[in-house]
Structures are given as C-alpha cells and as structure tokens.
C-alpha cells in the first residue's frame, strides 16, 4: 500500500489538497486525478504543486466512519452544545475561521475556554495518511463528502475529542459540517457567503487530552476509514 498526497498553492496561499492510500496498481490513475484537481481548481491557478508518494511500512488502523445524519435544519449552536462545547469556545472557533489568516491545518481549541492548545501557528495540525473504503460499493457519496467524512472520522476517533467544525475555503462551496463521535456527521448548509475564501478546521477537545499522542496519531498513523450503511 502507498500513501499519495497532493498540495497546491499560489504565493503560499492554499489552493487545493488531496490524499489517499492505495495499492500499487492504482498509483498512476490517482496521481492523474490529484494533478487535475490541483491545477484546475476554482480557487485559482497554482504556482506550486507537490505530489508525494510513500510506501506504507506499518499496519493500517481501521476506523469506522461516522454516521451521516441528514438534517437540512441542523443548527450549529445546538450541535456543539450537545457535545459539551461551550458558546465561548464556539465563538472563538468561528473567529479563527473568519479571520484573514490562512491556516493549512486544523486548530485545536479547549472545548470549555476556547483557548488554543496546539502551538503550530499557521501550519496547524494535519490529518494525513488515511484512505476511505465504502464496503457497500454503492457509490452514493461524492468525492467531496468522502474526503470530509474520512477526515472527520479520523479526527473524532479519540475519547477526549468533543467535536470538529469545518468550513471549506473553496470560493463557491458554502456547506460546512460539524462532526463528533457522539452525534455523527452533520452538514451545515449556507454556513458562509458565496465567493469568499475564508474557512478552516477547528477541533474542540477536553483539556485532559494528551496532545502529543493525539497529533502523532493524526499525522503519522496510517488509517483506513470504513464506511458501511445498514
């Protein structure tokens, strides 16, 4: 199995990213797909694109995908409250998402105080080395949803994670999500105005979490997210 990652940017501003884990015979078509995504993206033409291929040398951890909850009227404040995220922490998370700073990874905040707990600056924390397998093989989820669900499932695979809020920085995509192990994966429609580049990923955690161990899991452990519907 091989890990394949793509990142593209323009003047150090993030344009697009993608990754997966696949068999050797799928590398060529995966690289072509990532190349097309990186160079032909609505966020603009990149001046830098990097594709990295690395053989997986350790066991791959299986993670059960979060359940997708279909609720067109999902309310972010109600969802976060159910998961133990305070209004103060949510407001601080939205401040990070709406400011002009471009973070290339997730920001980890205390679910109680909203204080930032990681020390990675603009880089943030990156959930990497993962793939997504739909064992139903129905093909009823598009690529954007499978990528988001895979990341959300990895991020929430820890007992001290209260939930994750994600808002895409793509210009015309205005749907975000809030996800947690407790209540599943909820899409949030019209969470931002169209034709805006702000966005981000916020992880709300219990202050007792072992950050070093959690970050090592997100960034280094190979993970396969398995999606199954009843």
Swiss-Prot record:
Alphabetical keyword list: ATP-binding, Biotin biosynthesis, Ligase, Magnesium, Nucleotide-binding
NCBIfam families: PRK01322.1
Names of required cofactors: Mg(2+)
Pfam family, one: BioW
EC number: 6.2.1.14
Domain of life: Bacteria
Enzyme class: ligase
Pathway the protein takes part in: Metabolic intermediate metabolism; pimeloyl-CoA biosynthesis; pimeloyl-CoA from pimelate: step 1/1
Entry keyword annotation includes Magnesium: yes
One GO BP: biotin biosynthetic process
Function per UniProt: Catalyzes the transformation of pimelate into pimeloyl-CoA with concomitant hydrolysis of ATP to AMP.
Catalytic activity: heptanedioate + ATP + CoA = 6-carboxyhexanoyl-CoA + AMP + diphosphate
Protein name listed in UniProt: 6-carboxyhexanoate--CoA ligase
């Amino acid at each position: 199995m091989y890990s394949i990652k793509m990142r593209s940017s323009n003047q150090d501003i993030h344009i697009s990213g993608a990754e997966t884990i696949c068999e050797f015979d799928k590398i060529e078509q995966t690289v072509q797909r990532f190349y097309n995504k990186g160079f032909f993206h609505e966020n603009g033409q990149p001046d830098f694109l990097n594709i990295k291929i690395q053989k997986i040398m350790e066991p791959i951890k299986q993670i059960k995908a979060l359940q997708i909850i279909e609720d067109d009227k999902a309310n972010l404040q109600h969802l976060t409250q159910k998961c133990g995220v305070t209004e103060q922490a949510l407001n601080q998370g939205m401040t990070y998402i709406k400011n002009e700073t471009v973070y290339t990874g997730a920001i980890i905040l205390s679910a109680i105080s909203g204080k930032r707990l990681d020390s990675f600056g603009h880089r943030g924390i990156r959930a990497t080395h993962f793939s997504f397998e739909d064992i139903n093989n129905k093909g009823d989820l598009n690529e954007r949803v499978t990528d988001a669900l895979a990341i959300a499932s990895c991020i929430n695979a820890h007992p001290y994670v209260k939930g994750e809020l994600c808002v895409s920085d793509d210009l015309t995509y205005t749907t975000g999500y809030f996800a947690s192990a407790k209540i599943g994966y909820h899409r949030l429609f019209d969470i931002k105005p169209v034709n805006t580049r702000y966005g981000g990923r916020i992880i709300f955690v219990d202050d007792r979490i072992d950050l070093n161990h959690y970050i090592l899991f997100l960034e280094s452990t190979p993970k396969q997210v398995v999606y199954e519907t009843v």
